Amino acid sequence: MINPLRGMKDLTFDEAQRFVHIVKTAITIAKRYGYSYIETPILEETALFKRSVGDSSDIVSKEMYQFEDKGGNDVCMRPEGTAGVVRAFISAKLDRQPVKQKFYYYGPMFRYERPQKGRLREFHQFGCESFGEASVYEDFTIIIMISQIFQALGIGFELKINSLGCPECMPPYRQNLVGFLTEISEDLCTDCNRRIGMNPIRVLDCKNEACQSLLKQSPKLIENLCEHCDTDFKKLTVLLDDAGIAYEVDTNLVRGLDYYNKTAFEFVSNEIGSQSAIAGGGRYDKLVEYLDGKPTPAVGFAIGIERIMELVQMPETKKEGYYMGAMIPEAIEKIIMLGNRKRATDKVTVEYSSKGFKSHMKGVDKANARYALLIGEDELKNGTVWLKDLETKEEKSILLSEV
């Protein structure tokens, strides 16, 4: 028997229903905020992610499904969604238009990492990207939108926020951080030591518990922000306070991607074990320019669908549609034709073999249908059908032409 590859899985039955419910709910709310759908390829040039996510990130250095295709091109399966959306934004020359653009997307992402609960090698994300708005009000609005998605899904969360500064306040902070990290380098892991020279901010994202303990004493960027970044971050906290959204300022929150600046945030849940992040995002005002587009401020987020699958409060399923069945072989074609006609307006389950009454009623339950419609010998002779409403328990005989 051929099984799914390690770290990949099929979505069936209850999980598939949860997946669809999550995506539909998120789309409904995203549309209220003016987002429209965008689809980007799963396969992209590797250079896209090296330039955006960053060479020193775990994603690029350790986790990408990267290979050379038959044409000799260096390609990879997308490990995240933002870079592809930004590339598409530039390819369509939308960076040259004066209007603001907002897109939502959902689909599979791929990272070659150790599979564990809530973390697969193929996983799905729902994300939104907003282009052309530099105001911190947009950061706040996106956080509110995510909170509304989780509230609609019945998911509790905690919000963590931080500011990653800008090109003005980052260089002096980086210098202070390198000095601190150099002093404790002997006690840091190999990855952290490698990052000190390449991208010291990445050290703050280390998941090693020993490193995390040492990093609690590291210089805090939030205490070294320029006036503009400091004003924006304080404004964000005031807006969240006024909206009644509880949050924690996490000074070591840097996200796992190099393109973020200013606002960074994560939504976490204590109900899914150590992999507690269920959504994350932030501002990336330089990414469009890094990828050869016109300078365009932007902010976005992604929700890990598998991460929240078990947390979703599913709505009660209601009986809907019709179950149609024949009680004699001669009525099967009548049932099939009737079912095809009725599907123009309703959900219809048709049983293709003739069965007894009890067997058909079991089929009605299995299909979770509201209406049972059967044709037996008498009904076929009289040009009628037997119809029962499973909610009101009313049953009657009606003409075929009235169905």
Swiss-Prot record:
SUPFAM superfamilies attached to this UniProt entry: Class II aaRS ABD-related (SSF52954), Class II aaRS and biotin synthetases (SSF55681)
Disulfide bridge map: none
Entries under PROSITE patterns matching the protein: AA_TRNA_LIGASE_II
Enzyme nomenclature, EC number: 6.1.1.21
Transmembrane segments: none
Keywords: Aminoacyl-tRNA synthetase, ATP-binding, Cytoplasm, Ligase, Nucleotide-binding, Protein biosynthesis
Catalytically driven reaction(s): tRNA(His) + L-histidine + ATP = L-histidyl-tRNA(His) + AMP + diphosphate + H(+)
Enzyme class: ligase
GO MF annotation, one: ATP binding
One example of a Gene Ontology biological process annotation: histidyl-tRNA aminoacylation
A GO term from the CC aspect: cytoplasm
Signal peptide: none
Subunit structure: Homodimer.
Family in the record: Belongs to the class-II aminoacyl-tRNA synthetase family.
Annotated protein name in UniProt: Histidine--tRNA ligase
